[in-house]
Structures are given as structure tokens and as C-alpha cells.
């Protein structure tokens, strides 16, 4: 399985020379199996560049899947600018957590109302299917997808993709359930143990590490974790 990062930032895009090393766009990951199954995980502002790349490749009848972790803007802002959604003949399945107070489709359509964007979601040319998810496991062609709830202020899912003998785990916005675990050495129990089991033995782990150890104490409860390497 091949993975490419199109966006790794949080909150707001910051395209500038000082952010060039890791890029300035918000969350968007592309994963492809050896068979060619295309899965996009989150569609922040990095989704614009990915979409342009797919269109420039010239392929017709693109079939793809988008897994949305949650509907905070930095994870869905690329949807209105994701060019393959506007191409007739393309087919896309979009997945996201169930229980947002509205359907996934309604949440995504909200940011494309005329008040905010000139083209509504239902005028996209591609055929789009929407799937509201809970914790569980399902298959996208040859890719096995497992979901697990993360600890974040919005209802958020982490994704584990398994194909071609490897596993990729995407746990974008997550804070340890135990404050003791987040700030010092502690035994992993309860929901934190479930999370550890979910990410265990991943060949590639893409995980929240928003704050330095010095920053984190002032950000407890914000739904992100600090990074100090002790629990890697």
C-alpha cells in the first residue's frame, strides 16, 4: 500500500516558506493498494492539491472513497475544491461518523450552502454515496477498514487500513483519556488500552502530536495530545 500526505496541518492552512518542510495544508492523506483501490482519509485544504493531481492524471471514470474523521473545518474544507467530485462519470463514496445531530451528507452540504459557496453539494457532477459509520470493520474492495472512536470534542473516528500485508492507522485528533497517561508514566487501562490495541502493530501510524510537552498542560481537554516520545 502506498501512502502520500497532501496535508498534515491542523486548524488553519499555513502555506509559507517556514512551513515548507511538512507542508502548509490541513489534513488529507491518499492511500492506494497494490490493486489500485483509492482511499482518501480526510479532505482538508490538502484535498485541493490531491484533486488537481487526480484530474491532471487524465483518468476517466475515477472510483474513489473518502473517509472523514470528523467534520471540523480543517478536515472537510477541501471538499468544495476537490475537483473529481465535479466530474460526471466519477463515483465516490464518502464515509464519516454517525451521530453528528445530522447526517454526514447534511453536514458536508452545510458548508456548501450559497451563503458560503457558489456551488451546492447536490450539483456535483460525480455520483456520490454517503455512509454514516460507527465502530466496526468493513471492506473497501481489497482494503480492510476498521474504525475506533477517538477522544476529541467532536465525534471523531480513527481508521485502520489493512491491505497488501501492511497496516496503516490514522488517528488524527486524539487526546489520552487519562490525564495521568498524558502527562507522566502510567499504566494503560480502559479506553486508553483500547486505543493502544487499535494502533498496535501498525506499519505506519499517523497520530495526533499537536503540542510540545511544555505546551500541553495549558491545553488539557482540547482533544489533542502532547509529544514527548515516552508513549511511542
What are these regions (language model features)?
Residues 1-182:
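Binuclear metal-dependent hydrolase catalytic cores
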